[in-house]
Amino acid sequence: MKAVLLDKPGPPSSLRIGEISIPGPGVDEALVRVCATSLNPVDYKVAAHGYEGWRYPHVLGVDVAGVIETIGEGLVSWNRGDQVFYHTTWRKDGSYAEFNVAPAHTFACIPEGISFVEAATLPCAALTAYCALHRRLHVREGDIVLVHAAAGGVGGFAVQLAKAAKAFVIGTCSASNAKYVRDLGADEVINYRSEDVFQRAKTIAGDRGIDAIIDNIGPGNGVDNLGLLGPEGGLACIAGVPDLSVVPDLPYSISIHDIGLGGVMASPAFRRRQEDLGRMATEVMTLVQVGRIRPTAAEEITLEAIPKALERLAEGHVRGKIVARVQS
């Protein structure tokens, strides 16, 4: 099968297109014909340092939307020909290929009327945002939610999901993305280039503080983020947790969460959490079907164009999701 291959740890520019054998499914697994996959920052981040369990050449990618080709031993819940989408693992060969093998308990159905491209935007970005908001921060109606990097993949879904939960949403982005973020549902938009983000957010929230923060940028803003939280507020860190040794004591109960779906797939011992990926995917797709959120596919490319597109993604400031069509 055709795949995007990594011969050793390195940058996106080191990736190449090549041929490898089609894998076979194990017990309770399925072989899926990949119709579409989307790009995520985790792809180039793990490529840079590699993983001790990888066999090279390695296939990157964690987002799959496709059709079940072959059923593994013991699998009775899915059938050949079913259309599915799911978050696979970066610890084994991933989605930048014509076929992928994964445990079927992570699958969710692609309903009629939803394209493979639309479904492919959801697994990593939408499930990360959904996990942060509904499995960790437990956002409720009336909460004030701050989303950093609101025009990105996770950020865009976080804005939509928070708004679907009837929260008041503040998004940070550049001036060129302000309309896009407002169209996603943000009530207030802060231009991080021309405004003091934390002072403006504090002014918007007032004395009550912010209930939930989704930080897609990195740990450098940790102290400032925590200073915005109100009583029992929470910070969900998508790109690394802050150095807690420099965090001052706060006079109220807060929570800090490190969100990383890839770790859930590290071991069969985490099956309960893996099954929740499938449940979250189904819950997110239901919101798509009823129009509460929409997929954010901003650009469609070919499998061969993935290396160059990953280079652009690594440079930052990509709006929405880049999706590769792999097979029909």
Stretches found by the model and what they are:
Residues S21-S38, A48-R91:
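Glycine-rich beta-strand-centered segment in the early N-terminal region that forms part
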Residues A120-L122, A126-S194:
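Mid-domain Rossmann-like dinucleotide-binding core that forms the NAD(H)/NADP(H) cofactor-binding site
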Residues F85, L146, I190, D211-I214, ...:
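N-terminal Rossmann-like NAD(P) cofactor-binding module of classical short-chain dehydrogenase/reductase
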Residues D196-D207:
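Short amphipathic alpha-helix with an adjacent loop that forms part of the alpha/beta core around
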